[in-house]
Amino acid sequence: SSGIGLEIANNLANRGYNLVLTARREDRLTSISKEISEKFKVKVDFISCDLSDINSPRQIFNFCNDKNYKIEVLINNAGYGIKSPFHETPMEDEEDFIRVLGTSVIALTKIFLPSMMESRNGKIMIVSSVASFSPPSSIQALYGPIKTFMNRFSDSININYNHLGISSTALCPGFTVTEFHTASGVQDEMDRVPSFLKFSAERIAKEGVDAMFAGKPICVPTMTYKILVFMLKSFPASIL
């Protein structure tokens, strides 16, 4: 309903795709569904749910199935950060975090894969992060490791299902101007990031969607972050 996810929705609608949107904020979903539908002349439906609820992926699938929606493109984008140090964060919060960023991605992909296999056509995007290539951080202890796992999971989908016309793209943006940092309580840190390292959600979405339709397994948007990731891969973590 905001940030990269909203811009991906706009990009797909501009390509003529009908959309099923999901997020927690029903009021936002109502307004943006109307805006996108009127602007791009496509059908937009939505279901409000919280992916920290283990039942949400099945609820999303049932919603689409009951309405006979055929999902050709699956965007796994939900995410947030945890500001508190790992040792101070309640385990319940860590479990919710893992469900939103990890388990729900696996569940949604697993649930929608069979119909893609049947049609021998499907595009999947998993919104990961440049943090997946970075050394461990003193804060956000789980964020980078989960994103690294998501990259590997995306690779696994490609290895197992490319021959059936299904591809998965891990989109790995760097700092992006969205509500993410405010919602995660780390806006102060974002404000200190140099402007040349910050990019618009619209640009990130465009590069990601282009890469997804091109069947690329991974997309690191902008030359700035391509160079950074090359350096992260080239040098040992001990000297970074």
What is each residue range found by the language model?
Residues 15-31:
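Conserved glycine-rich Rossmann-like NAD(P)H-binding loop of the short-chain dehydrogenase/reductase
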Residues 1-19:
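Canonical Rossmann dinucleotide-binding motif of NAD(H)/NADP(H)-dependent dehydrogenases/reductases
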Residues 77-82:
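Conserved NAD(P)H cofactor-binding loop of Rossmann-fold oxidoreductase domains
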Residues 129:
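Residue(s) in the substrate-gating loop at a strand-loop-helix junction
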Residues 85-87, 93-98:
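Substrate-binding pocket helix/loop in short-chain dehydrogenase/reductase
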